[in-house]
Amino acid sequence: MTHEIRAIFDRIAPVYDQLNDWLSLGQHRIWKEMAIKWSNPQPGETFLDLCCGSGDITLGLARRVGATGHVYGVDFSANLLAMAQERSQRKYPYQSTITWVEADVLDLPFDSNQFAGATMGYGLRNVKDIPHSLQELYRVLKPNAKAAILDFHRPENAQLRSFQQWYLDNVVVPIATQLGVKEEYAYISPSLDRFPMGKEQVELAYEVGFASATHYPIANGMMGVLVVSK
């Protein structure tokens, strides 16, 4: 399954940002900013951005930790990491403060208690073992560190859930089809059906040891941010 998902993200890399704009009605950058804010980066700190994709959140974190801090952007798609690196060279002057790492979030190549905070944008839904992924995140965070995990969410409201499904079927998949990546985006709906709801995410976070966990529904419950503290 991991190899299949890695292959999907390698294939969609060229149209990833364009599709994210359509997927989110142009709002994903606002939601990513919310996740950054909740993770509370401070100047000089070392931060981690998991499933960094094309680097939006990584760059946002880098701007906040500044020239004296450091951010590690981690993804298992080599194509997306190459895109992220290219974008960062155009948009961010302090290249030495960002390290791009090709790695699996289920087996992070970092020491325990290494990071002052972390983010994950649209990644938790795609890992094959969510509790283990949260355990790895817990391991690499310093005591009292915060992390914010942004992802799609099935709304509890039946009408909003119907709208979300209609939008995925009638807007997202046709656009993906036009861009030649229909199969790659058709998986979003089944992945959402498997994904734990907000309160279940909170329970999983407590089970792996986090001291506090809160799930914030955003975009009428069609997105959510899980905020945890070690």
Residue ranges and their predicted role:
Residues 45, 106-118:
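A short acidic, Gly/Pro-enriched loop at the edge of an enzyme's catalytic core
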Residues 3-4, 150-206, 214:
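C-terminal alpha-helical "lid/dimerization" subdomain adjacent to the S-adenosyl-L-methionine
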Residues 25-45, 60:
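Conserved alpha-helix/loop element of class I SAM-dependent methyltransferases that forms part
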